[in-house]
Amino acid sequence: MKPPRRSTARNDAPTHAAAPPPDASAHATDRSRIAAWRLAIGLSLGSAIALGLARFSYALLLPPMKADLGWSFAQAGALNTANAAGYLFGALAFPWLSRRWRAGTLLAAGCVLTACLMAACGVTVGMQALLVQRLATGIGSALIFVSGGVLAARLASASPRDAGLLLGLYYGGTGWGIVASSLLVPATLVHRAHGWQPAWFALALACVLCAAIAVSAARRIEHNHRPPPARVDDAAAARASPARFAFALGGYGLFGVGYIGYMTFIVALLRDAGMSGTVVSAFYVMLGVATIVSARLWSGLLDRMRGGQALAVLNALLGIATLMPALIVHPAAAFVSGVLFGATFLSAVASTTAFVRHNLPPDGWPKGISAFTTIFAFGQIAGPVAIGWVSDSAGLARGLVYSALTLFAGAALAAAQRALRRAA
């Protein structure tokens, strides 16, 4: 008698790997997105050093330094011009440097250089020495800002769903530097000869703290996010010369002239209008906070607009913000101006990186970002001296009017820029 045959239904059935539950997949995606946000925020402390601490803090230091050292507005603007000239040299050198060293290495070198030079400004009173130090600080700032932009673009391409947000988070990090400056500078100024010097030391210490986080984030991005592979149509895009995006470059250059006039002299204008130090510090804090939150505000625009339209919109809004305190001398107008300006000006910078990411292949990003940074630096060189000269002869309000007109002209140029290739 044969033993009863065992059922083989379970064994004969085809076997499949169990699919992960939908909730698990969603949680993994959420964790990946949050990790990308954290990296972008960490990296953004590099932009906090490059612009917020190393450059825009000077607007708060300008009034006490001008009074203590007997400068004219043109002389005071010359220090920002020297800083912008250094920024230009750094931007021009970046494509060559990036072929020899990784972006993370260049960012770290820029952080060290900038922190040391910020401290050096605290022991210097001679105009010539300060000019040299501010020029060298600009070189360090460019290394930080451009290499950080390359890494942010790489992170954005690895997370296309949040690409605009990630770029905005990186550039919006400048707001952290503005907020830190607006708190540190008034707290460390002392009422004596050269009483502005301790503020430079405080800013240098803030640079060191921010650098530790930014360099760590840069290393993780380089380790986890390699440059994406080139696409089929990348060969044609790689051959595109800067002449093909000349309108965007021109609009961005005029942005550099117009925005730096505002950021250099707005604090002096408010103080000349009789506003207290507390009001001015609160204004600068609000400007910085608006810069930080701007990442979310404009992320959709940066994702949708592949040509120069985003830069055009932002330049026009910046022109309006710049006109407000020149035409209406009231704290309320100043605060509205600061919030609008803060919410838009670093997104204008982010829009150029978004343009490069949309229109050039990954191996062309360093060259593209460097081209925008270079024209931006030319604008920043001209801006402080030109607006300072106008302000010396016709008043600070007239200088801001000229800044606004420059921004409107930049909006018109950027609006003429078309995308270099169609969306994939």
Model regions: which residues?
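Paired small-residue
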Residues: L117, Q128-A136, A332-L340
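Helix-to-loop junctions at the C-terminal end of transmembrane segments
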Residues: G90-R102, S294-R306, S391-D392
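Cytoplasmic helix-loop-helix junction between adjacent transmembrane helices
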Residues: Q133-G172
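Structural signature of the two symmetry-related core transmembrane helices
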Residues: T105-A119, Q309-L323, A404
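Extracytoplasmic gate region of multi-pass secondary transporters
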Residues: Y58-A59, R244-V285, V289-I292
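Helix-loop-helix hairpin linking two adjacent transmembrane segments in secondary transporters
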Residues: D162, L166-R219
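Helix-breaking motifs and short loop linkers at transmembrane-helix boundaries and internal kinks
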Residues: G70, R102, V123-A129, R306, ...
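A late C-terminal transmembrane helix in Major Facilitator Superfamily
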Residues: N359-L396
